[in-house]
Amino acid sequence: MIINSLKRFGITTGAAASAAAKAAVIGLLNREKRNTVVIPTPIGLRLEIPVEKVEIDSGIACAEVKKFSGDNPDILDGLVIRCCAKLNESNEIVIVGGKGVGKVTRSGLKATMGETAISPTVRDMVINAIREVTDKGIQITIEVPNGDIIAENTLNKMVGIVGGISILGTTGIETPVSDDDYLEHIKCELNVIRQSYDFVVIAPGNSAAKYASKLFDSNSIIKVGDRIGDSIKLASSVFRKVILAGLPAKLLKVYAGIFNTHYSQGDARLESLTHASVLAGLPYDVLTKITNALSVEEAFTYMTKEQRRKVMKIVAEKILSRIKSFNGDINFCVIIFDYDGESLSRVGC
């Protein structure tokens, strides 16, 4: 039996940009085309990163580095980050976002509204990498070929970054199969919402967000996927009120105490529904059908609308109780929608 216990780490877009910038500056000043460069990182490690291409012309040099995501399932894996370097008359390093790098259109993010989406940490990484080569003034333009197209498949638009991807990274290194970046995205989006609202609506998925938008301004709603517990904790520290709005199947997991609802973390949907149905006093014949159902949706077909309301009220109350148990000061509300978008239960609202 072969056990694959070694996972591959990757590099962030920020590390790729730093490497491309350093390679471009070496090409500009030394007329040298490097196959690899070594860059410093904020955590003290040094990374040797392959350089795909270096182009040297009169007064300018450009280098390309491919982002490598390791064992992370990442749409940006293999993305080309291109940096072009030229001298400027100052002694400063000026970093400009070019084609394919997104622009920030809303406040609450690390980059200022109106600027390109290059995080302050990445700017420091680029400067530190270049300063290992020269003390001269340099202008660096970061580009991402097809970045505007690739960005359509990312979460950037939801946080107000348009026209391209973000150049990010806090360490320069991507941990394998890590969802830290997704939590960072949730933090960013919560910060954006906080600029306009003192409450936030947490919706696990698209349908929940759609139904919630009938009750709340769509700009106050954040889609968090499976990270319900983490999102509630993050939101509770910055918002006056936190509202969890979802469909039965997802929230039945939370009823059972499963706050990361990814399938790999557990599944107790039908067991939870059966338990809540017993507490609601549903007839034995209905309970039997529920326990034999293959899905929550199927189980719902055996219940009247009034029975659904009674059961989901119990579910919502239990979720409220669970949330209060680890954050007693939170002003929390639970809304459960039926599969047609009708509100079945509202507790704490």
Curated annotation (Swiss-Prot):
Domain of life: Archaea
Catalytic reactions of this protein: Co-precorrin-5B + S-adenosyl-L-methionine = Co-precorrin-6A + S-adenosyl-L-homocysteine
Record has Amino-acid biosynthesis as a keyword: no
Enzyme class: transferase
Pathway: Cofactor biosynthesis; adenosylcobalamin biosynthesis; cob(II)yrinate a,c-diamide from sirohydrochlorin (anaerobic route): step 6/10
Keywords annotated in UniProt: Cobalamin biosynthesis, Methyltransferase, S-adenosyl-L-methionine, Transferase
Biological processes, Gene Ontology terms: anaerobic cobalamin biosynthetic process; methylation
Listed GO MF terms: cobalt-precorrin-5B C1-methyltransferase activity
Keyword S-adenosyl-L-methionine: yes
EC assignment: 2.1.1.195
Family per record: Belongs to the CbiD family.
PANTHER family associated with the record: COBALT-PRECORRIN-5B C(1)-METHYLTRANSFERASE
Designated name of the protein: Cobalt-precorrin-5B C(1)-methyltransferase
Originating species: Saccharolobus islandicus (strain Y.G.57.14 / Yellowstone #1) (Sulfolobus islandicus)
Gene: cbiD
